[in-house]
Each structure stands twice: as C-alpha cells, then as structure tokens.
Amino acid sequence: MNQWKEYSSLANISDQEAEELCQVLRRRIIQVVSQTDGPLASNLGAVELTVALHRVYDTSRDRLVFDVGHQCYVHKMLTGRNGQMETLRTFGGIAGFPKPAESIHDACIAGHASTAVSTLGMAIARTRLGEDYKVVALLGDGSLTGGLAYEGLSMAGQSGEPLVVILNDNGMSIDASMGGVAQHLAKQRLKPQYLQAREIYRKIMNATPPGRVLHRVFHRIKDAIKTSLLPCSMFEDMGFQYMGPVDGHDVKTLTRLLDYASKVNGPVLLHVKTIKGKGC
C-alpha cells in the first residue's frame, strides 16, 4: 500500500500494477474486518471497480456517491485513510460509510439504500453553475429493490445530464441469463472500435434532414433486435446509454469503459457483474 499512498498516483499506474494493487487491497480488507467487524463480502466484491474508478476520476473534485456506503472501504484506503482503518466503526475512529466531515473525497453521507441516483441534483447544479466536475452514482446491495432508485433513474435518463450510474450486480438476478448470441453481441458493444464508429455514424447521419430520417428508421430496427436479445431495454427506455454486462473483476476493461463513459455528453449506465466475497 505504501506505493499508492496518494489517490492521484492511480491515474498513471499500469494495468498490471492495478491488478497487483487489487490483491493487496483484498488482503488489507480481510485484515481490517477481522479486527473491526463490518461488511466483508460487499467490499471484497467491489475492489476492482473501486480501483478502476480512482484511475479515471479525481474524487477530490469529482462526485462519487455510494448507495448505502457499505462497499466504500477500498475508497477510504485509497484516499489517505489506510492508516486509520484499524479504527473503523469505533468511537472516535473513521466511519463505516462515506462522511464528508472525514474527507473531501466523500461527496455525501450514505447509509440508506436506493438514494445514490439523487446525484442528478449535483449534475444539474454543475451545469447551471458552469462547473466541470464529473458525477458518478454507484448502486449495489439490492438498491434496485427500492422505488426511489427507479424514480431517480427515470429523471436522470430524461434529463440528458452527463451522469454515470454504475449498477454493481452481485447476483440479484436482475436480468435473465443470456444465450451465446446475446453474450457475443454484448461483448461487441463494449469494444472501443464499436463505440467510436457509433459516434461517427451518429454525427454523419444527423448532419442532414434525410440522414436524420434514416437514422430514426435504423434506430428503431436496431432497438427491436436488441430488445429481443440483450438485457438493456429498461435502462435505454429511461434514456440511458447502456453498457454491459461487463466482468466487474477485470480492472483493465473497467478502466477503459469508465474512461469512455466519463466523456459521454449524457447519462450512461454501466452494468457490472461482480462476485460478493471474491478472494475470501
């Protein structure tokens, strides 16, 4: 951990170093929780995702909001609090959830499920004030069982505000299992070449009135095929650009997709599949 004392150093580490860091963090989580108690499985499952987030975003400026907050231990370790982790959840020690009074890297207090997409308010405030920070909401631990999450998703999708929502799906069976063709198509949709080609196609087609008409026709045909094969219809119907499902323990791919999502001028939902308690 001494090699990565400062969160900012993660932006320049290699993929191999990121993978090594994830293993170090897993051992550290087990060490800390064995002494202080607390949610072990959810934190072990979010290691690669949290490292990837810190490779892309600057949490001293960007807003990273955890739903519930029980999976924030790696975030705390990477933002100057690793040496205090033995005081976790003790009187006078650091909190077991994000706490702005504790660090500038904690955007707001969490503790209740289904509230993270309320970060839409931060995104709207950013736009109106002419600021340029990024906004990310991390959903997990059954947050989609609460109606408040769907209200937030509906409003965020229709707002058009640049906002990234990450769905940490650790086995809640949100979608039906996918067949071979659907899995292949999902992988193709995540490739950089596809993402770049789609943006170029969109700009060309929207440049002229006939192009816009053709774009709408092709878009409807594509949606009909995609809806029958891929588990993204609900989120795209809400107005999100859907990406996934993706392996939540592949830190290289996660970093690439988060970097892309951070540059999209609109709401993005990244669906990440993780294993609770991985490495334990």
Question: Where are the model-predicted features located?
Answer:
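Gly-rich Lys/Arg/Thr-decorated short loops/hinges at beta-loop-alpha junctions or inter-strand turns
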Residues: 1-9, 27-32, 94-106, 133, ...
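N-terminal amphipathic, basic-rich helices that act as targeting or association modules
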Residues: 1-79, 234-240, 245-258, 265-275
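Catalytic cores of large soluble enzymes that bind and process phosphate-bearing ligands
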Residues: 10-13, 17, 21, 37-45, ...
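A generic secondary-structure signal for well-formed alpha-helical elements
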Residues: 29, 57, 156, 170-171
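Cofactor-binding active-site loop characterized by glycine-rich and histidine/acidic residues
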Residues: 39-159
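Short beta-strand segments
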Residues: 67, 138-139, 164-168, 271-275
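A glycine-rich helix N-cap at a beta->alpha junction
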Residues: 83-97, 157-175, 186, 193-196
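Long, well-ordered, tryptophan-enriched scaffold segments
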Residues: 171-280
